[in-house]
Amino acid sequence: MEVNVLNIKGEDTGRKVTLNESIFGIEPNDHAIYLDVKQFMANQRQGTHKSKERSEISGSTRKLGRQKGGGGARRGDINSPVLVGGARVFGPKPRDYWFKLNKKVKTLARKSALSYKAQENAIIIVEDFTFEAPKTKDFVSMVNNLKIADKKLLLVLPEANKNVYLSARNIERANVAIASALNTYNVLNAETLVVTENSLKAIENILS
């Protein structure tokens, strides 16, 4: 699949790049995508949730009534989970939600996500660029020139670029990622991928 290379003014440079079929042209595997996104979302959780159980709450431990002969059900103390205002049973405890996912599955998931974007013609290749200073105006101008101002976009750079990152930081529908940290969730969460030429080479090197 060939894609025209544009500059940040939205103009065609006259060059084309070929998207690697083994990365951008595979049959997407939805289950691999599900597992990778599930792991990503699980890793975002703090896992610090906690509720006090019967032995931890404040309250009297006096038995409410005699064991037998009262005519009603047996009663312990007022902390009993059976009673209104009593303790929580099997409440949440701090835990780590991380789970293992094989590298092959993660790679397949990223390839599947990129293939979906290629099928939707939602990948724009731009020549490598940088901003002389962090200016939101410059980033907005680029987005307008590429005619994607109404899209949620992910800009993929070959390496961290402070000026570009700061220029995009205040744009609600824009995110910036480096090629080596590209993940399935970010790819799928964006409506359009804007990938620089060197980023494309880096992605192909990583996923080949």
UniProtKB/Swiss-Prot annotation:
One Pfam family it belongs to: Ribosomal_L4
Highest taxon of the lineage: Bacteria
GO CC terms: ribonucleoprotein complex; ribosome
GO-annotated molecular function: rRNA binding; structural constituent of ribosome
Keyword Ribosomal protein assigned: yes
Disordered, as annotated region: 44-79
A GO biological process held by the record: translation
Keyword field contains rRNA-binding: yes
InterPro entries: Ribosomal_uL4, Ribosomal_uL4-like, Ribosomal_uL4_dom_sf
Biological function: One of the primary rRNA binding proteins, this protein initially binds near the 5'-end of the 23S rRNA. It is important during the early stages of 50S assembly. It makes multiple contacts with different domains of the 23S rRNA in the assembled 50S subunit and ribosome.
Family that this chain belongs to: Belongs to the universal ribosomal protein uL4 family.
Protein name (Swiss-Prot/TrEMBL): Large ribosomal subunit protein uL4
Taxonomic lineage from the root: Bacteria, Pseudomonadati, Bacteroidota, Bacteroidia, Bacteroidales
